[in-house]
């Protein structure tokens, strides 16, 4: 399979879209001194190659009343139950991230809640998932770094 290569214009397009995925192609074209058609064609090609996959919406959970963050380490009864447990965790909307891990926990989850009572109920719900042996919870005091943009910029500099 031939590797798709990005040139400097592609990098600049991606840099702009990383900062704001809703930037109009005409604005990008003006910044890069190319036509809007060029931007459209290049973005379409990057979408076709799977480099760009949709666009995302970022929410401010705190402003929506979900400022409490907990990380839950999940111990399974048997590792063969991993996929079934993951499928059940998908049904709990407050579980926003789940990783299958090697090490102390079988699964590691990020949970968003309104407060401690809400978090307690969510953790009990996780504990009740068939296949879960027990959990350990860590409460986040502050989300100090949550910046996917820096990683994306670093990757594009390597390409």
What is the role of each PLM region?
Residues 1-159:
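A compositional/biophysical signature of low hydrophobicity enriched in polar/charged and small residues
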């Amino acid at each position: 399979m031939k590797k798709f290569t990005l040139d400097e214009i592609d990098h600049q397009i991606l840099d702009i879209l990383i900062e704001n995925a809703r930037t109009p192609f005409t604005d990008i074209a003006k910044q890069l001194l190319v036509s809007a058609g060029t931007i459209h064609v290049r973005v379409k090609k990057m979408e076709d190659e799977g480099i760009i996959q949709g666009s995302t919406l970022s929410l401010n959970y705190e402003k929506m009343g979900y400022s409490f963050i907990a990380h839950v380490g999940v111990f399974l009864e048997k590792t063969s139950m991993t996929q079934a447990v993951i499928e059940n965790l998908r049904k709990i909307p407050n579980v926003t991230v789940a990783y299958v891990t090697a090490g102390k926990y079988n699964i590691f989850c990020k949970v968003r809640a309104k407060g401690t009572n809400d978090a307690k109920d969510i953790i009990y719900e996780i504990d009740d998932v068939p296949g879960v042996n027990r959990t350990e919870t860590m409460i986040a005091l502050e989300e100090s770094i949550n910046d996917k943009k820096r990683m994306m910029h670093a990757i594009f500099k390597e390409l």
